[in-house]
From Swiss-Prot:
Source organism, top-level taxon: Bacteria
Name this protein carries in UniProt: Glycerol-3-phosphate acyltransferase
Gene name per UniProt: plsY
Predominant subcellular localization, coarse grouping: membrane
Single GO BP term: phospholipid biosynthetic process
InterPro entries per the UniProt record, alphabetical: G3P_acylTferase_PlsY
Enzyme nomenclature, EC number: 2.3.1.275
GO cellular component: plasma membrane
Pathway recorded for this protein: Lipid metabolism; phospholipid metabolism
Topology in the lipid bilayer: Multi-pass membrane protein
Record localization: Cell membrane
Organism, as annotated: Bacillus velezensis (strain DSM 23117 / BGSC 10A6 / LMG 26770 / FZB42) (Bacillus amyloliquefaciens subsp. plantarum)
Keyword vocabulary terms for this entry: Cell membrane, Lipid biosynthesis, Lipid metabolism, Membrane, Phospholipid biosynthesis, Phospholipid metabolism, Transferase, Transmembrane, Transmembrane helix
Length: 193
């Protein structure tokens, strides 16, 4: 029973629509009606600006971190990665935003920030290298996921490898429209990096 409640709590934490809340507070807008229409950090940066976008990405990361920490904080015998995955699902399909959320990148990163902080730090560095080289946030996110799988092949943690592989596949799936735009050369590039 406690495990089920923890999973539900992790999902609810993940469901907190950071982009929607920050958009309303910072600019008085629903970011789902602007830019890509996505609740995630990339649309928040593009729609709300750097300050508000930074708040959104920090909140989205912290959702994953908090959810992964719940088993330790509440002394519930469940693997922290499972609680983290529940938060990622909540982020992508948020109960508080008509089940239309982000693309799972920042919240997945937050899970790894708690469970494998060194991996998280290297992921951030790799993401920015890819971003500098490609100028595509979406492609950088997907390539960072692939890097994460490769990293996990050298770590003796089968749970981490399985979860990272599933999350990366999910992130790539969530970016399928971006992949089409990259192929068609219509995906927007960042201009500030």
């Amino acid at each position: 029973m406690l495990i089920a409640l923890l999973i539900i709590l992790a999902y609810v934490i993940g469901s907190i629509p950071s982009g929607l809340i920050v958009g309303k507070l910072a600019k008085g807008i629903d970011i789902r009606e602007h830019g890509s229409g996505n609740l995630g950090a990339t649309n928040a940066f593009r729609t709300l600006g750097v300050k508000a976008g930074s708040v959104v990405i920090a909140a989205d990361i912290l959702k994953g971190t908090l959810a992964a920490a719940l088993p330790y904080l509440l002394h519930v015998p469940i693997h922290p990665l499972l609680a983290g995955v529940a938060a990622v699902i909540g982020h992508v399909f948020p109960v508080f935003a008509k089940f239309k959320g982000g693309k799972a990148v920042a919240t997945s990163g937050g899970v790894l920030l708690f469970y494998a902080p060194l991996l998280f730090v290297t992921m951030v560095a790799v993401f920015f290298v890819f971003l500098f080289l490609t100028k595509f946030v979406s492609l950088s996110s997907m390539l960072t996921g692939i890097y994460t799988i490769i990293y996990c092949l050298f770590v003796k943690d089968p749970y981490l490898l399985v979860v990272v592989t599933l999350l990366t596949a999910f992130v790539i799936y969530r970016h399928r429209a971006n992949i089409k735009r990259i192929i068609n050369k219509t995906e927007p590039k960042i201009k500030w990096f």
